[in-house]
Design a protein with these regions (language model features):
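Phosphate/anion-contacting hairpin/loop surfaces
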Residues: 70-183, 189-196, 204
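A cross-family signal for N-terminal binding/gating loops and helix N-caps
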Residues: 1-121, 126-127, 261, 277-290
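Low-complexity, intrinsically disordered regions enriched in charged/polar residues
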Residues: 1-4, 35, 39, 70, ...
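Basic, nucleic-acid-binding surfaces and adjacent catalytic neighborhoods in DNA/RNA-processing proteins
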Residues: 22-41, 54, 159-290
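Generic detection of long, well-ordered alpha-helical segments
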Residues: 1-4, 100, 150, 154, ...
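Short clusters of hydrophobic/aromatic residues that line enzyme substrate/ligand-binding pockets
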Residues: 45, 143-146, 238, 255
């Protein structure tokens, strides 16, 4: 599943190519992935123009001129593929990114007034697109459970420490993976941030000092910003909004580097399981807090 930097990269690409396009038709073949009434589609989607695309956690939100919006979650195998004067593929890459469309994985087709089209493809049918009033987005159950955006300038270290300490008996990795604590951080960036802050992934959240949590707070921000600059990662073969693979993993310090040398101390990177997830860390740099 794409994490915050990958979805942010897709958002930026969609904003570059879709703004002010008018939707003239919508077709879909999987009602569970597009659970919207024909009446709402005809009244609030068809004929609307795209105002902007934004991100909340790991979801995309496309705002429309009708004051409705499309909330999109790509899940594991979702794609957004644009075909027009320019082309791009965003999401899980397979032949659908470059081959003829629609194909057997196409679930939704948006056609615009300039004859360009946006395809939502999803092989495993876990992703979805919901049409709803803008004012109701924040009331979605999963949206209400989301924690702060890590890169929001209004999110400060003291709030971060408070949120972490409310889960004092959980491992620090489980804590920062919890979307109610932080929105958008997943396995890759949890491992990288903990390495940067020199914190063992299985350390209990309640054992970490203010100084350590402040360092982790800044490390999460730095890691996410760096990944966005590099177009995200290629975990699960994720690609960005122009069909280019993100290059973050080429610069990763621990993620998927088990058996290799730590770039900071030269020790061997190990892989263990923490919070049911494969976890990469340096045993010398990241000693467990007692």
């Amino acid at each position: 599943m794409p994490e915050l930097p990958e979805v942010e990269t897709v958002k930026n690409g969609l904003n570059r190519l879709l703004i002010n396009k008018k939707i003239v038709s919508v077709k879909f073949d999987w009602p569970k992935g597009f659970p919207n009434s024909d009446a709402d589609v005809n009244k609030f989607l068809v004929g609307s123009r795209i105002i902007k695309t934004r991100r909340r956690g790991k979801s995309l939100i496309i705002n429309l001129s009708s004051m409705y919006c499309l909330v999109i979650h790509l899940k594991m195998t979702g794609q957004l593929v644009f075909r027009g004067d320019e082309q791009f593929g965003a999401g899980h890459p397979n032949d659908s990114l470059i081959g003829p469309l629609p194909d057997k994985s196409t679930r939704v087709i948006f056609e615009f007034d300039d004859n360009s089209r946006l395809f939502f493809n999803d092989q495993r049918k876990f992703g979805w697109i919901r049409l709803m009033p803008e004012v109701e987005v924040d009331n979605l159950d999963f949206m209400k459970r989301l924690g702060p955006e890590p890169l929001n300038p209004d999110f400060k270290a003291n709030e971060f420490r408070g949120r972490v300490r409310r889960r004092k008996n959980s491992s620090i990795k489980a804590t920062i993976l919890d979307q109610s604590v932080l929105a958008g951080v997943g396995n890759i960036y949890a491992d990288e941030s903990l390495w940067m802050a020199k914190i063992h992934p299985s350390s209990l959240s309640g054992t970490l000092s203010d100084a350590k949590l402040n360092l982790l707070f800044s490390s999460i921000k730095d890691v996410l910003k760096k990944s966005i600059e590099l177009g995200g990662s290629t975990d699960r073969n994720y690609v960005d909004a122009e069909g280019k693979k993100g290059s973050y993993l080429e610069f990763a310090n621990v993620f998927r580097r088990e058996g290799k040398m730590c770039s900071r101390c030269g020790s061997e990177i190990l892989k263990i399981r923490v919070a049911t997830r494969g976890t990469h860390y340096c045993p010398k740099c990241q000693r467990k807090t007692k």
